[in-house]
Amino acid sequence: MKSVVCHSAKDLRIENTELPALGEHQLRVNVAYGGICGSDLHYYQHGGFGTVRIKQPIALGHEVSGVVDALGSGVQGTVKGQRIAISPSRPCGHCRFCQAGQHNHCLNMRFYGSAMPFPHIQGAFSEQLIIEGYQAHPIADHLSLSEAALAEPLSVGLHAIQRAGSVLGKQVLVTGCGPIGSLLIGALRRAGAARIVAADIADLPLKCAKEMGADETINLKTDAAALDKYKVDKGQFDAVFEASGSEAALRVGLDTIVPRGVLITVGMGGDISLPMTQIVAKEVDLRGTFRFHAEFATAVRFLNEGLVNGKPVITGILPVERAIEAFDLAADKSQSLKVQISFQNA
């Protein structure tokens, strides 16, 4: 079967790989669509991110949907031909973090397409996958398999909101309106945020943010002072979600957040310096957010029930044979948001 495998920076190959045997409680799935994530791009462009480096060939991808092709003898509640979104989160269930309900911090996590552990955890950009039964989340008849592959990035946004606490009736700023930022805006709208301001440095993501429910969009590249009005009286936003990984964006968030507001760092852009005096003086609650687990089921339900419409986020779909072109397109933020690879009829 064909798989999209990264060997090192700028060395992405479409290779034939072997499918593992089907276990008793597992499913064999024909992969339909896979979305290219920012972490996939980091592996492709730079060979990793931060201290995480590719040390062996790794199949990329963790945002996938598909159709069940075969079932292990012990699987119940799933049928052949069922259309599913596939959760990439595979915690052990036994370590102290899993036992505490913090599955995203599992000490033995097998998250698809991750070079954090060694040997690396192979990803989901393959024509077929063997998955655990619990990873399969059925999708509604009306939901396309392309949209179903958005469940993963939507889950990231839902976990970020969970980390922030209630946003009901709150004034919210989102900086960075790529796929995760835009889907986060859709989730914030559903969670009852009173007003959502979206900021970015490009028009395309801001257009998407507007379609996803932002009340105001601001291009900080063309109007650097546009957020100054929100700095008055010690800040105006109850919550800030920083989804770009930019130090400048984080500082803007600190300037515009109210005292004792919650600032959630969603994007990972590397280590930065922080204005600790400002954080202390404003008593800002600075929180990280990392992946998700239980939120995946909620994300699928939101998509199934039309509570969040992810269609505006998808800007390109290319067949697996053009995977390298798809990665290059995904890296061009002037013309793309979420680019997906199609494995159907590959």
Which ranges hold each PLM region?
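Glycine-rich beta-strand-centered segment in the early N-terminal region that forms part
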Residues: 20-34, 49-99, 140-143
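Adenosine-nucleotide cofactor-binding segment
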Residues: 174-177, 189-252
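Glycine-centered, small-residue-biased loops immediately flanking beta-strands
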Residues: 261
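NAD(P)H dinucleotide-binding glycine-rich loop of Rossmann-like/cofactor-binding domains
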Residues: 94-175
